[in-house]
Regions:
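Beta->alpha loop/short-helix hinge microenvironment recognizer with preference
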Residues: 1-234
């Protein structure tokens, strides 16, 4: 029995070889990602050969270098983490996750560039707004944000992971520490919800919509929902 966990490539190859995917239903970009991952480090990508003077040969198949491929982006990810570690301070940091309601997913998919920009901008705005309040910090914080678009079950699930400094600099340049508690989750959740939906409704490219009334109804429904914001020390 093979206990090895399947990789994304294993899954893609399985559905391709068993005719379980209709590539014609994918966008051009999605088809490229799918095909690149299937070929990554396979013979069709070409190879480099190491040869020892003793006659031993070792073949290395080339990577696809697609930004969405988890295999050949691993080094870049580790390089990014190492680079950002040089900018960390000897302070407390908090891990904050912002998740969008699934009702908005169809509209995010219609215009991902706008949807993701809206998510980044309003998350940053919400965090900075609370940080400037003397009741919480009264200063300017640091934020590193990373977008995730998949859930653990491989479904479309856009959410933002943020590493937030446990404190900030006030107008006098003094450091205000926040070691035990960042912001009330409920307050942050409501503020984020309001900022996101306000921007989303006002600036969404309406030319992409077939039914504006339905869009407005979905936005109104999301106003009444509790939005998921999660925070803890990383």
């Amino acid at each position: 029995m093979n206990d090895k966990k399947p990789t994304i490539q294993d899954i893609f190859l399985y559905v391709r070889d068993n005719d379980l995917v209709n590539l014609s239903r994918l966008t051009k970009k999605q088809r490229k990602v799918f095909n690149d991952i299937c070929r990554c480090r396979k013979q069709e990508m070409g190879c480099n050969t190491e040869k020892c003077t003793c006659g031993y040969k070792r073949i290395h198949y080339n990577s696809c270098r697609n930004p969405s491929c988890p295999m050949c982006q691993r080094f870049k990810r580790e390089e990014w983490v190492d680079k950002n570690n040089h900018y960390t301070l000897n302070i407390t940091y908090y891990h904050v996750v912002f998740t969008l309601p699934e009702e908005l997913n169809p509209y995010i998919l219609l215009d991902k560039r706008f949807g993701y920009r809206c998510l980044f901008d309003t998350v940053s705005d919400a965090l900075k707004t609370l940080a400037k309040d003397p009741k919480y910090i009264g200063g300017t914080i640091g934020i590193t944000a990373v977008l995730h678009t998949w859930s653990s079950t491989m479904g479309f699930h856009p959410h933002l992971h943020c590493i937030v400094s446990g404190g900030g600099y006030n107008q006098s340049g003094e450091w205000i520490s926040k070691d035990k508690f960042l912001f009330p989750v409920l307050v942050l959740s409501k503020l984020f919800r309001g900022k996101f939906l306000d921007t989303f409704k006002k600036e969404y490219p309406l030319r992409r919509l077939n039914n504006i009334t339905e869009f407005n109804n979905v936005v109104s429904e999301c106003c009444e929902k509790d939005w998921v914001v999660y925070t803890k020390e990383p």
